[in-house]
Each structure stands twice: as structure tokens, then as C-alpha cells.
């Protein structure tokens, strides 16, 4: 065989290999998509109900915490020698 024939045979084998790999990857992608749809039909994820009332801190809780926060800040400043 001449060098040109060997080069041509190598190129043919390269394209055949690339073609088979691409074909395998496409089949793999479609198989994974199919399995995902199949699993989701038999085992759907439960839908969580939205909470009807947003969580908010009530004003009386904040009013009760205000002196505690002020005392904690004053204690910290006394320890650090800031005041």
C-alpha cells in the first residue's frame, strides 16, 4: 500500500469511528430522556402547597427585645472599653 492509500484508509476509519461515537451519544441522550420521563410519570415529585401566611415578626416581640438589645450593646461596649 502506498502512503496515499494508507492516509485515505486512516481518514475513513477516523470518520467511521467519529460517526459511531456520535451515534452512540445520540442514542444515549434519547435513552436518558426517555428514562427520565418514565420515572417522572410513575414517581412524580409532590407539589408543595404555598404557605398562606407570610412569617413576620410581630411588633410586640420587637418591643420586648429592644431593651435586651440595648443592654447587650452596652455590656459589649463596657467590656471593650468603648464608653
From Swiss-Prot:
Positions of transmembrane segments: 10-32
GO MF annotation terms: decarboxylation-driven active transmembrane transporter activity; oxaloacetate decarboxylase activity; sodium ion transmembrane transporter activity
Localization per record: Cell membrane
A GO BP entry: sodium ion export across plasma membrane
Entry cofactors: Na(+)
Gene Ontology CC terms, in alphabetical order: plasma membrane
EC number(s) reported in the record: 7.2.4.2
Purpose: Catalyzes the decarboxylation of oxaloacetate coupled to Na(+) translocation.
Protein name: Probable oxaloacetate decarboxylase gamma chain
Native source species: Pasteurella multocida (strain Pm70)
Lineage, broadest ranks: Bacteria, Pseudomonadati, Pseudomonadota, Gammaproteobacteria, Pasteurellales
Amino acid at each position: 500500500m502506498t502512503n496515499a492509500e494508507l492516509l485515505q484508509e486512516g481518514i475513513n476509519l477516523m470518520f467511521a469511528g467519529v460517526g459511531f461515537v456520535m451515534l452512540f451519544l445520540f442514542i444515549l441522550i434519547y435513552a436518558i430522556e426517555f428514562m427520565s420521563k418514565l420515572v417522572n410519570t410513575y414517581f412524580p415529585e409532590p407539589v408543595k402547597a404555598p404557605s398562606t401566611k407570610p412569617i413576620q415578626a410581630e411588633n410586640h416581640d420587637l418591643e420586648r427585645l429592644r431593651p435586651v438589645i440595648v443592654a447587650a450593646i452596652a455590656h459589649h461596649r463596657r467590656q471593650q472599653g468603648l464608653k
